[in-house]
Amino acid sequence: MKILLTGAGGMVGKNILAHTKSKDYEFITPSSKELDLLEKKHITTYLKHHKPNFIIHAAGIVGGIHANINNPVKFLVENMQMGINLLTAAKDNNIRKLLNLGSSCMYPKDCDSGLTEDMILTGELESTNEGYALAKITSAKLCEYINREDSEFQYKTAIPCNLYGKYDKFDENNSHMIPAVIKKIVTAIETGKSEVEIWGDGEARREFMYAEDLADFIFYTINNFTKMPQNINVGLGQDYTITEYYKVIAKILGYKGTFVYDKSKPVGMRRKLIDNTLLSEFGWSNKVDLESGISKTCQYFLNEKNND
């Protein structure tokens, strides 16, 4: 099977390609220069030339709360354009199977736990990443519409919880929470800081899955695509407080300082726990526990840092 993987240079893409099962398939992994997803005619030409059997859409403009608040236009427009362009070009080229990666930010902000796939578009979105969420919802809905118009097409959406792991961005201003905290605590250790600041009161809860597990789910899905639901949550079914994540990371890195809370800072949704019922029925569950995943991620960061 020939698979086009968009976003091959990102964390999810790199984890897919590093997975032991990747060698069983022929992957096409264009960079954004080789395949500009903001230009539909480029995509059409590329698909006609390479003729993939299956597409995994993992490309996107991503970032943590800082980046989403500061760049709402970019997060909405570019993510939406990439999704619409790729999906419609794939349909035009008669590519029958496509796995679209969504995000748990697609869910309403007031539905804090037990988020089921049918809750999409049932309430107001969290304002701090609304643009990104709208783009992801648009792609998921477009997948549904394409299938509805022609049942020969199977365009489906996986909705992972928050991710972390190897190949992530470790930048306090533009990264997701876990890599940002790892970098923050490593810096505190190196500079002898006795305190580390946490945004908010530390009681907001988040569900984070090791990205290697998502790659494992994707290979399971490729082999069981017909029985995969239209939209499916992919997560642990368990969450932790922000403070608990800080404590686990501090323990692994050996940081002995204290945490202080800046309650004037935004924290996003208070809770965002997805429901794993359909995932369990589909027959997949995650393999890597939180402490093991964070330990591997810390080691990856330190290795990369020492090699710079």
Curated annotation (Swiss-Prot):
Gene3D superfamilies: NAD(P)-binding Rossmann-like Domain (3.40.50.720), UDP-galactose 4-epimerase, domain 1 (3.90.25.10). It is an enzyme of class 1 (oxidoreductase). The active site is at Y132 (proton donor/acceptor). NADP(+) binds at residues 7-13, 101-104, 136, 160-163, 176. Substrate binds at K184, W199, R206. The record marks S103, C105 as: Important for catalytic activity. Keywords: Isomerase, NAD, NADP, Oxidoreductase. It comes from the Bacteria. One of its GO terms (biological process) is 'de novo' GDP-L-fucose biosynthetic process. GO terms for molecular function: GDP-L-fucose synthase activity; isomerase activity; NADP+ binding; oxidoreductase activity, acting on the CH-OH group of donors, NAD or NADP as acceptor. Pathway: Nucleotide-sugar metabolism; GDP-L-colitose biosynthesis. It catalyses: GDP-beta-L-colitose + NAD(+) = GDP-4-dehydro-3,6-dideoxy-alpha-D-mannose + NADH + H(+); GDP-beta-L-colitose + NADP(+) = GDP-4-dehydro-3,6-dideoxy-alpha-D-mannose + NADPH + H(+). Its EC number is 1.1.1.356. Belongs to the NAD(P)-dependent epimerase/dehydratase family. Fucose synthase subfamily. HAMAP family: GDP_fucose_synth. Involved in the biosynthesis of the L-colitose (3,6-dideoxyl-L-xylo-hexose) present in the O-antigen region of lipopolysaccharides (LPS) where it serves as antigenic determinant and are vital for bacterial defense and survival. Catalyzes the two-step NADP-dependent conversion of GDP-4-keto-3,6-dideoxy-D-mannose to GDP-L-colitose. Homodimer. This is GDP-L-colitose synthase. The gene is colC.
